[in-house]
């Protein structure tokens, strides 16, 4: 266990494990200067510290470093994670009077919920239980509070649960679990809007889904502009990994897309919509006339029945072209009508005058 490693390491070096931190997950190629640069910024609220040593952890394929805090630490301001080279570095520390195994399990549970122990106390609003007082709280009291969280999760905790993004690497040969870039981008664009946290946290969550060249690009754009927004990061991904067809190409591709032989009109409209949205994104077609352009292209590029053509012509003459869903509703209704009419004709009995046995009885 990580905390046990911290205790053993401190015991070997004869330092106080209550005034020490262990940072894990540091890439092997990260120099000491790079490590110091990250730690100095993140651990500034803790005052002076001393770097005691570094070890390689084979199971993580990463390094860990041990720090000695030279001033009495304020546990409530110690971060559990820091953003470093190659991704997230975990910070391991020991609090006074804590039960090692219990608190490790508690932290693991809260980590899955997107929470911390101090954040849990703030959310529950316990009288007299501030984050600064947390080191002196007994495991029994922590267990009681955890039971409250499980039985009655407070509202401030719930929004912190967030939908995670699928993995994306941008590699030439993607992993089996990866989505195509366009699918991943569409998902990411929608999900990041739901994350109820600050931009810095959104960028950290976004980075958790990135691997390989995609992660490298994220580091580059953040280095160029530390205040860059998540939306701007996704725009950078679109420029590097997306389809780079020109405005003119996307416009021509849309206008020259026609209904194929044997293809239903509704299927054609659905296929056309993907191209239209791409053209709008490229600003090849103004967004405010997209409904009008869609209707005109369907009337020009599809083989329509006389009834459907008249209905669409009527919609066009009204001056308020239908939205995509409204247009699909009209087309699907007409397709259902045509299918019903064809079925009725198919089911009519064979015979000369079409009256069936009723007509035969009348002639008797």
Swiss-Prot record:
Sequence positions bearing N-acetylalanine: 2
Annotated localization: Nucleus, Nucleolus
InterPro entries from the UniProt entry: PNMA, PNMA_C, PNMA_N
Protein name: Paraneoplastic antigen Ma2 homolog
Keyword check for Cell membrane: no
Predominant place of localization: nucleus
Organism phylogeny: Eukaryota, Metazoa, Chordata, Craniata, Vertebrata
UniProt keyword terms in alphabetical order: Acetylation, Nucleus
